[in-house]
């Protein structure tokens, strides 16, 4: 029998070799998405190192998100759905950093589908659904990101004034609980500016919140009424 060697290259890396380009972002399918990001943002690739990070990140994340939604994964707060939510929100933030206004994910997903539909016809069949999911998640995040970024900026200034380099777990949890900022997003923004997060403090704040929610649930009956009031009412009767 013929022996084969698994190089572990993957299709993209193999395409880099076959197309004689420098990186996966230069192969034909990825370049089309990358160029669309540049078109929407008005930025040029390989002109600014920070812009390039955002361009590559959005290119990678929108491709992943498009395929995940096609596979039936929906944005949520747990499991694979949480991974999807994180990459959509991360791409949305980097879109803002590039100056892209409004929702833009569906426009990029259309390019992903055009480039991949021959090999993955299900993308074309599900494109309207994919566009809808991306746009809804993007709009949901847009409602909170501006407020959250403003609050985080205020926290950064307070840390600078106090000569501190670590955001308290309580403040990190406030951003998560009130403004929908995943911990890793807050962490990414802060690390760009030389700050860190008290992750243990964040976990503690989350446990306190879970306990409060659990205790509140125990204190109510199935219709949400205060159990103590019900018992008092029964006794009075």
Predicted segment positions?
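Extended, domain-scale alpha-helical bundle/helix-rich regions
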Residues: 141-225
């Amino acid at each position: 029998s013929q022996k084969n060697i698994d190089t572990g290259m993957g299709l993209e890396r193999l395409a880099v070799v076959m197309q004689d380009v420098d990186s996966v972002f230069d192969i034909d399918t990825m370049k089309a998405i990358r160029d669309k990001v540049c078109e929407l943002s008005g930025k040029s690739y390989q002109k600014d190192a920070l812009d390039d990070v955002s361009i590559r990140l959005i290119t990678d994340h929108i491709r992943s998100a498009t395929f995940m939604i096609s596979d039936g994964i929906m944005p949520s707060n747990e499991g694979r759905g949480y991974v999807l939510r994180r990459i959509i929100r991360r791409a949305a933030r980097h879109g803002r950093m590039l100056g892209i206004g409004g929702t833009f994910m569906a426009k990029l997903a259309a390019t992903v589908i055009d480039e991949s539909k021959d090999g993955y016809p299900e993308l074309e069949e599900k494109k309207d659904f994919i566009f809808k999911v991306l746009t809804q998640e993007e709009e949901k995040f847009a409602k909170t990101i501006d407020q959250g970024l403003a609050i985080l900026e205020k926290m950064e200034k307070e840390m600078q004034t106090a000569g501190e380099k670590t955001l308290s777990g309580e403040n990190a949890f406030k951003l998560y609980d009130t403004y929908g900022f995943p911990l890793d997003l807050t962490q990414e923004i802060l690390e760009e500016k030389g700050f860190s997060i008290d992750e243990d403090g964040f976990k503690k704040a989350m446990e306190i919140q879970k306990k409060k929610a659990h205790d509140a649930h125990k204190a109510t009956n199935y219709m949400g009424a205060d159990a103590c009031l019900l018992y008092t009412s029964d006794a009075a009767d």
